[in-house]
Curated annotation (Swiss-Prot):
This is Mitochondrial HMG-box protein CIM1. Residues 1-90 form a transit peptide. One of its GO terms (biological process) is mitochondrial genome maintenance. It is found in: Mitochondrion matrix. Residues 27-102 are annotated as: HMG-box A. Mitochondrial HMG-box protein that limits the copy number of mitochondrial DNA (mtDNA), antagonizing HMG-box containing protein ABF2, a mtDNA packaging factor. The gene is CIM1.
Length: 294
């Protein structure tokens, strides 16, 4: 047999904006408590179903993950705190030394904005997206099928100057970037990937436009008194966050001590038979902590 130096390879359609996001993708351990909960839900499927059925059900199935997310969001706080303790114990998270911001991210607890401008931008983005969605709904009602004329007209609207489009105190201006719809009639993987990339490009372009509009509104339309009021709200939010995290850490430490006292921590791991299992986020599934029956 003669060896060949030909290497068959192709570019991946997946793109990463930062080095940290790429490294996080390589790390398959669950980063948040919900990802840990999702692992346990997939593990239940491994216990009661065939491997082939699990692959077909989980791989590329957003409905299953949406179902798990609804279960997680509707879960009581007491039960969710038990998952918090199980997650931190399984991932060896030092809750006393890790920063409160990092711990809140791992537990998916809302954290305060880093600055007054970011707090303003969060509110601005909500209204910006709402206004953009309303324009899209009006466009769908007026024109059933997107045409070149409509796209040109939308582009002309987006290219108006600042003097023709007045800015409100917080409300986003009407100079928006149109989004390109993905056609559902194209079923091939190549066309779908191309349309998805175009949609992602348009979304990033709209986000950049939102940041530009928000910066203009912050510098030109928000006066000193309004900025001072935003600063006071942020200070109150940070104080409540510190108090809430102190309480959560105490409860978390108590639950972890109880689990360790009764020997509820398991070092057993269930490994998927196929490394291509797309369980997202991990194909090494830790055993759950089983509560002893009274």
């Amino acid at each position: 047999m003669k060896a060949t130096l030909l290497l068959k390879a192709q570019l991946s359609p997946v793109s990463y904006t930062t080095k940290k996001s790429f490294q996080r993708q390589l790390n398959r351990t669950p980063y948040t408590a919900f990802q840990y909960f999702f692992q346990l839900e997939v593990q239940k499927l491994h216990n009661v179903s065939k491997y082939e059925d699990i692959i077909n059900h989980v791989r590329g199935n957003s409905n299953f993950k949406r179902f798990a997310r609804n279960e997680w969001d509707s879960m009581s706080l007491t039960k969710k705190r038990l998952y918090y303790a199980s997650f931190c114990q399984s991932m060896d998270i030092d809750i006393l030394n890790v920063s409160k911001i990092e711990l809140a991210k791992r537990l998916e607890i809302p954290i305060p904005a880093m600055s007054e401008y970011l707090l303003f931008r969060n509110k601005f983005k909500v209204k910006f997206d709402s206004h953009c969605s309303s324009l899209e709904r009006k466009d769908r009602k007026s024109v059933p099928r997107p045409s070149i004329t409509r796209k040109v007209a939308t582009t002309e609207i987006c290219s108006k100057s600042r003097s023709n489009t007045p800015v409100g105190k917080i409300n986003p201006r009407k100079r928006l970037v149109a989004l390109k719809r993905i056609s559902r009639s194209e079923n091939t993987a190549k066309n779908h990937s191309h349309e998805a990339q175009n949609y992602l490009y348009d979304y990033m372009k709209r986000f950049q436009q939102m940041c530009k509009e928000c910066r203009y509104a912050w510098n030109e339309e928000v006066d000193y008194d309004q900025k001072l009021e935003i600063r006071k709200k942020l200070q109150v939010w940070r104080a409540k966050f510190e108090e809430m995290m102190d309480n959560e850490i105490q409860i978390l430490q108590k639950n972890m001590d109880i689990m360790s006292k009764f020997g509820l921590r398991s070092e057993s791991y269930l490994t998927a038979a196929n490394h291509d299992t797309n369980t997202q986020p991990n194909n090494i599934l830790p055993m759950t902590y089983l509560l002893k029956k009274k």
